[in-house]
Amino acid sequence: SAFPIEKGISYCRVFSVFFPSYNRGYGNNFSLQLGAFVFGAVNLDQIPLVISGKFSLPKTTSIGILNTSFALGGMYVQIPFEFFDEDIGLGIAFGTDTFGNNFNHFSTSIGWGYTRYSGDWELDDDPLINIAGNFRFTDSIALIGEQWFIPDLDLDDSPLILSTRFIGRKFAVDFGGIMTLENIVEGILPFPIINFTYHPR
């Protein structure tokens, strides 16, 4: 979403076991994430490192469901030298528009991927689009969903993620799956995902 992490608030998150991250809010508008992609027992110099930042603009509208928030951000992934002979990185620059509040909201995001190869930067011509939503059934249960639209990929093959979030005082756990419309039609089971979030304070 376009919502910022509040000033001084931090949390640790593990996405599908492979992507642990530390997230923190600075000031009232800037959020920072530091993470890594960890696949099994590998050396530290073989782990792709991730840094991302998001600047949430001051809210412009605050009337019920029309409560609107905007954010601009970017993510960068440094690929280890072990994988390629050259210095390689990739990432995305994006903008997000969110309607609603922290409990129930709907977001649309558009972003352009980019790559860095031996010091040369290249921006993709076509954008990625993401539509996401969060619906809070109770104080402790929420439904989370997002649909990706990827250039040169048919809608039937685009990733769809659905999960149920169980929310505690300091912990939250997501159980869900990644699927495509084609998988659903063919009766193929979703790829399972499980996420953990811990709020120290």
Q: What are these language model-derived features?
A:
Residues S1-F106, W112-Y117, W148-D152, D156-R201:
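Transmembrane beta-barrel domains of Gram-negative outer membranes and organellar outer membranes
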Residues T108-L153:
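A mid-sequence, solvent-exposed acidic-amphipathic segment
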